[in-house]
């Protein structure tokens, strides 16, 4: 929960950049001037993002990314929006616009970020079209929407993890069976929220020589955002 000092700092800020989607509602709901807020996802109460009228499935997001790669998509209420290259472009553009509005001679641009994001997308497009991947939690949805690979994570398991719930025993068993049966080419694993269930799935992947790419919610200590982003997309692009 925010302290009174946290709320005071937020209200004093000329610009507040937030995740949105309920992830950091504690801070943006406390700000009196909502016009100072720049968000990657719609501002909403926690757990209400899936009620966004623009919410879509991962398959729909993949189709959208082909037609309009710059469009930010809300994939089933998934809050890991900073892995969406389109969101990076949009937020950067909003920041530049606000800076230029406040300081007419600032000349803020997004050229470097736009170029960097295009390179990230190109790396992701290198993934094979027939790649079957699964995730211990849907951390890479916004990256994988730029690929033709198929998310074969069992539906029940995916629904539970995207809503931050605990998967049912049957869904975990289905996940491990899919790995044992050779239906998973790549496992995406979040080491920062490793649970007993996720560890079992990772062990099954290791036992079956399934490639594993680790993607955390935030960069490891000592690593900058873009550095980690490049590392993650490079690892994915090798498969």
What are these regions (language model features)?
Residues 1-239:
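Extracytoplasmic metal-acquisition and chelation regions
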């Amino acid at each position: 929960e925010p302290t009174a000092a946290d709320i005071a700092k937020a209200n004093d800020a000329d610009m507040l950049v937030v995740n949105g989607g309920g992830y950091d509602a504690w801070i943006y709901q406390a700000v009196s001037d909502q016009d100072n807020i720049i968000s990657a996802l719609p501002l909403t109460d926690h757990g209400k993002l899936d009620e966004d009228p623009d919410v879509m499935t991962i398959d729909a997001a993949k189709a959208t990314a082909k037609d309009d790669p710059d469009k930010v998509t809300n994939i089933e209420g998934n809050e890991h929006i900073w892995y969406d290259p389109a969101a990076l472009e949009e937020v950067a553009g909003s920041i530049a616009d606000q800076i230029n509005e406040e300081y007419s001679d600032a000349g803020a641009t997004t050229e470097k970020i736009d170029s960097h994001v295009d390179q990230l997308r190109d790396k992701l497009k290198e993934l094979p079209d027939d790649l079957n991947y699964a995730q211990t939690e849907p951390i890479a949805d916004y990256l994988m929407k730029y690929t033709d690979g198929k998310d074969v994570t069992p539906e029940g398991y995916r629904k539970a993890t995207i809503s931050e719930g605990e998967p049912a025993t049957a869904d975990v068993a289905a996940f491990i069976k899919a790995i044992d049966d050779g239906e998973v080419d790549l496992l995406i694993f979040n080491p920062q929220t490793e649970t007993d269930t996720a560890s079992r799935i990772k062990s099954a992947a290791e036992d079956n020589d399934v490639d594993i790419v680790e993607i955390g919610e935030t960069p490891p200590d000592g690593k900058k955002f873009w550095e980690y982003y490049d590392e993650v997309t490079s690892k994915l692009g090798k498969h």
